[in-house]
Amino acid sequence: MNVIDTDDLEKHTPMMRQYLTMKAEHHDMLLFYRMGDFYELFYDDAKRASELLGISLTARGKSGGDPIPMAGLPYHAVEGYLAKLVQIGQSVAICEQIGDPATSKGPVERKVVRIVTPGTLTDEALLQERQDNLLAAVYQGKIGFGYATLDVSSGRFVIAELDTRESLEAELQRTNPVEILYSEDFGELGLLNGFKGKRRRPEWEFDYDTSIKLLLAQFGTKDLHGFGIADARLSLQAAGCLMQYVKDTQRTALPHINAITRFNQTDSIVLDAATRRNLELTQNLAGGRDNTLAAVLDNTATPMGSRMLQRWIHQPLRDPKHIKARQQAVTELLDTAAHEGLHEQLKALGDIERIMARLALRTARPRDFARLRQALGLLPELQQSLSTLSAPHTTQLRQHLGEFPAEQALLERAIVDNPPMLIRDGGVIREGYNSELDEWRGLSEGASDYLVQLEAREKERTGINTLKVGYNRVHGYYIEVSRLQSSQVPLNYQRRQTLKNMERYITPELKEYEEKVLSSQGKALALEKQLWEQLFDFILPKLHELQDFARAAAELDVLSNFAERAETLGYTCPELSQDIGVQIEAGRHPVVERVSQTPFIANPVTLHNQRRMLIVTGPNMGGKSTYMRQVALITLMAHIGCFVPADRALIGPIDRIFTRIGASDDLASGRSTFMVEMTETANILHNATASSLVLMDEIGRGTSTYDGLSLAWSAAEYLAQQVGAMTLFATHYFELTQLPELMAGVYNVHLDAIEHDDTIAFMHAVQEGAASKSYGLQVAALAGVPNKVIKAAKHKLQQLESRDHQAEGTRTPIQSLLALPEPVENPALTKLSSINPDNLTPKQALDLLYELKRLS
């Protein structure tokens, strides 16, 4: 019943009319409606909250003639429930009581004061500290897509113009947004499957002119040329929608969102969605973080450093100058052992990046200011540590750290050493910071001494030995006397409360003092909140410089982390070459070597202009996939400035990394395993270049032998002769090992294994040449296939091999392929393939039909 017909509102009680009106304004999210010490949910919201949160579903009387489904949760536990809801992509509007129940006629005045959505979180308790929290918007044009992401918790705003569906899929995989806005006309909803927090927005929110006005107003500029994005029309439309959504949900100024950058695919190595998934960069195939490249490389000191590292992993650089700048910084940190002390210093900084976002939104809490004070206090020591380093990139980062002595001194004077969680109850501002506040606090805090003196004086005056002076929050100050002695109280004692064995009284003097104290407490709290707001005003003029400080500290953290990982894990600095190629000596898989229970077998790889494709053969479980992945991961690590697990690595320029490794049904899109495999293969064949690194594993296994072999052969041939990409091509089709005899630049390598009787030992060592056999039956036995089945399979294998040897004149599959004549070009088909029917008039179409008839 959450869609409201305003004509029916009069049927409901005044309170429910108020609720339903607010719900109509926030129809696409749960409405937490404050009633006393609880947040209540009604109707469909109550049913959904009961299901999602496991809270009781009850009913609250009737309104409009029907029982009202209701669910509630205590206000003090709301953050825990919010965390659960945003994790599953649910948005919440929080409606608070802003009126005074004592003076209200009718329902207490209420207002939605906070909107919590997965992509607009800034509260520390609701965020994953080592993951970016991205809000995204996507807009589809006639050709291509506009894509924008915004991290409200840091202010990072990025747009991208994407030409193809595959590019958008890769960006979604790279950025992994927690909330996605899309237009009503968006036609690729299948790409959003698996993402939580999807929001369909009206088309007008993506209007180009409106978007430009919003962005110019946000950045305070006359145009967008300074950001280098003026021509990015589609992504600016997406960015405008994001900006409007954030303004609607945050309902405050957003000064920390002060720049926007453009993601250019040409600046980094392109990784498509399949590659990011198959290489398990920051997420494993089960959706977790364990046993990923990020899990191995991340020993950063700060959450902001961890988040930056993950962004680097997904954006390997192409410019060798930038890569070498990082390498030089890491080398110097390692050679001087400066990374050891730097790690501890950076760790004490905390998450300044997100603290600055909360300061900008004025939602920071007292402990945020305390952490900022600590970080600023550590800056001189950090600057001193870096002053001995001379690597250009480190020197540049040191300059961006800045100096903030005035701000640090202010926070030192203003904030107590261990502030409470919230400003609500006071106790945040340090004594001595403001004389007026000290005076009001003195009146309030002097109450204890006054009450002791009053109690002693009244005991002496009345002679009542059971007399006590006390205070509680309900009745205020009182004089308590035992019931047995209550007849002895003076006439100026006015009864305030009767208990079982006690009577409580108030006197004119005590009443006057109570009003004075309570007034001073209220005035002290009001003044403290005023001083608290002034702290924001003092700090925010330095917002941009403090954001630079946070970014520089995060990058220093990543570089220091690279030095530590190189030392701890035995990594070496890769060499960068201007010549295309990947040459690795004793390379290791960075993840497998960390989780393996046995010593990892290091292996080489050599790819260059004269050796562009390796046909990789060997048994299942022999290590083919591990070997191929380690080549890709070492190449990627080299391009983020990280040292690599190898004795030596020489890496040339790379434009893209492709992987076609493993496959499963894509049930959501209705695609079989073989269809998924062929789609990924087609993407590689269409987009790979001579500067690409391609990993192809078991192409063609999802269909018949002849079909599969034909596809594998043709794909390998196309990559070797037409594309010239650096390729590792793993296969169980041993016929493909004949390719090196037919094509230049193609070589065989294999993973070694030793067979003894019916057992097999995998050596995991890469050797030149083709494997002698596949050892499929031995692997099946290791997997636990029953002995009877293995014996029957051996018998059938012997029959097949014997028949092949005895069948005179028969051809092997590869011989059949090689014997086929080259296809003859058909002029009619050639002409037909060049026609675009959308561009033909009826007369032209008729003429073409006659021409095709003549050519056929």
Swiss-Prot record:
Q: Which UniProt keywords apply?
A: ATP-binding, DNA damage, DNA repair, DNA-binding, Nucleotide-binding
The molecular function GO annotations come to: ATP binding; ATP-dependent DNA damage sensor activity; damaged DNA binding; mismatched DNA binding
Source domain of life is Bacteria
Q: Which GO terms describe its biological process?
A: mismatch repair
Return the CDD domains for the record. Answer: ABC_MutS1
Write out the residues that bind ATP. Answer: 618-625
UniProt cross-references to NCBIfam families, sorted A to Z: mutS1, PRK05399.1
Q: Which HAMAP family match?
A: MutS (MF_00096)
**Summary of the function given for this chain in its UniProt record:** This protein is involved in the repair of mismatches in DNA. It is possible that it carries out the mismatch recognition step. This protein has a weak ATPase activity.
Q: Which family does it belong to?
A: Belongs to the DNA mismatch repair MutS family.
Q: What is this protein called?
A: DNA mismatch repair protein MutS
Q: Which organism is it from?
A: Shewanella baltica (strain OS185)
